[in-house]
Amino acid sequence: MNYPSNPNPSSTDFTEFFKFDDFDDTFEKIMEEIGREDHSSSPTLSWSSSEKLVAAEITSPLQTSLATSPMSFEIGDKDEIKKRKRHKEDPIIHVFKTKSSIDEKVALDDGYKWRKYGKKPITGSPFPRHYHKCSSPDCNVKKKIERDTNNPDYILTTYEGRHNHPSPSVVYCDSDDFDLNSLNNWSFQTANTYSFSHSAPY
């Protein structure tokens, strides 16, 4: 193979060796072939790269100039990949045990507004489980309320997720504007702080 002469003998030009212009075309052809097969039985290949690998000019044995970006491959059955992704996004779960001999509405009084979307019997328990979702439009927090089978005087409340908004029962104000001692039914916080009420931790 005849290589072009290098006008600068003190450096080696490798641009002729690094030809990656056809890489994208080749990869697209491979992905088209994979796409023609049955995805339910074939492994799935997912690839991501933000930049191309470009040519390098080596000016000395100790100095290189090579621009690369990481490539990530995820190989496996489609269902397995979905399970792995779901596992990474598991919600934050908190369980509280509250003594209450009245009804489950007491467990709803946590400072947030909830919308009931279901009720389901529990195997081996005379008490059903109630399902609620936060009524704030962009909040995905859910909670389940049920009586403890071993001790019906207690209610188990399971929270999934974390609220992305303050509690509606918390009033934000400037402390100079109000006499805080005269309004005992409210939980006050100063206007320049943004935190959740201790009465509604999740």
From Swiss-Prot:
Transmembrane segments: none
SMART domains: WRKY
SUPFAM superfamilies named among the record's database cross-references: WRKY DNA-binding domain
Broad class of the protein's primary localization: nucleus
Pfam families attached to this UniProt entry: WRKY
InterPro entries documented for this protein: WRKY_dom, WRKY_dom_sf, WRKY_plant
Domain of life of the organism encoding this protein: Eukaryota
GO cellular-component term (any): nucleus
Annotated DNA-binding residue span(s): 103-168
Cellular location(s): Nucleus
Keywords carried by this UniProt record: DNA-binding, Nucleus, Transcription, Transcription regulation
UniProt GO MF annotations: DNA-binding transcription factor activity; sequence-specific DNA binding
Biological role stated in the UniProt entry: Transcription factor. Interacts specifically with the W box (5'-(T)TGAC[CT]-3'), a frequently occurring elicitor-responsive cis-acting element.
Similarity comment: Belongs to the WRKY group II-c family.
Protein name as annotated: Probable WRKY transcription factor 59
Classification of source organism: Eukaryota, Viridiplantae, Streptophyta, Embryophyta, Tracheophyta
Gene name in the database record: WRKY59
